[in-house]
Amino acid sequence: HCIIGIERNKPECIDLLTSLTREMKGVEVKGLPMRYPQGAEKTLVETCTGREVPQVGPSGKPGLPADVGCVIMNVTSVSTLGKFLKTGIPLVTKRVTVEGDAIARPQNIEVPIGTLYRDVIDACGGVKEGVELGKIIFGGPMMGGAAPSADFPVLKQNNGLLLFSKKAAALPEPSACIRCGRCIEACPMGLEPVVIAQDFANKDFAALKARCVDLCVACGSCTYACPAKRPVSQTMGLAKGWYMAELRKGGK
């Protein structure tokens, strides 16, 4: 059974794909709730099938969609697979969204994998006149990472390039945690970032295991919700990284 999940704020896309797949047995187009991060694979599995991916799979490692009989594929992967079966040509180009307040001509552009960010930026008119470039983000605004320079290549997993001016890229000054719990409310996986941060500071492996730190999907919702402007998502990433490293070493 194949389920094509599309957020409900794209009704034309839902109608089109429903029409195109009407005669296909075992194919269902499903409208999904408009909430972030709806595209996370574990969220998709639960929304589309009602199945919950376990924290720990049969192998003893973190659970995967396959543990509940599901395979998640994004649109690009499915399209590329179809083209490969027809032509034998693998994934050699990537569609990249170039956006931000510092880019002259924001647009979607298809480029060969390996193209330098610098060349992609030039193809979009370069940096706006009179604007000082502050930061280049590869990926989206919530989960993307900062590039040290424009001399980095587009990889197959890159789907966005954001250019921010120095003003837009300026980081807010963090203040002390006020323990308001908004990071807990924002977490789609039901984690407790404020508690996990303390467990990580104490390097408490057992506590991090009990708090299910390995379920973090790095969506950035906790940082976005934090009124104290603390780098909560980065701390979660460090905590998960440390926990997984200890787990590989046989930590208990």
Residue map of PLM features:
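Structured core elements
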Residues: 3, 97, 108-110, 137, ...
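Flexible, glycine/charged-enriched surface loops at secondary-structure junctions
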Residues: 1-7, 29, 93, 129-139, ...
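Ferredoxin-type iron-sulfur electron-transfer modules in oxidoreductases and energy-metabolism complexes
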Residues: 160-174, 184, 188-224, 228-252
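Short, surface-exposed connector motifs at secondary-structure boundaries
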Residues: 1-2, 101-104, 222
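Acidic, glycine-rich active-site loops and adjacent beta-strand->loop/helix elements
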Residues: 8-10, 140-143, 242-243
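Hydrophobic alpha-helical positions that pack around
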Residues: 6-117, 123-130
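Conserved active-site and cofactor/substrate-binding residues in soluble primary-metabolism enzymes
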Residues: 12, 72-80, 93, 112-115, ...
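Active-site gating/interface segments in enzymes
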Residues: 37-38, 45-49, 86-88, 126-178
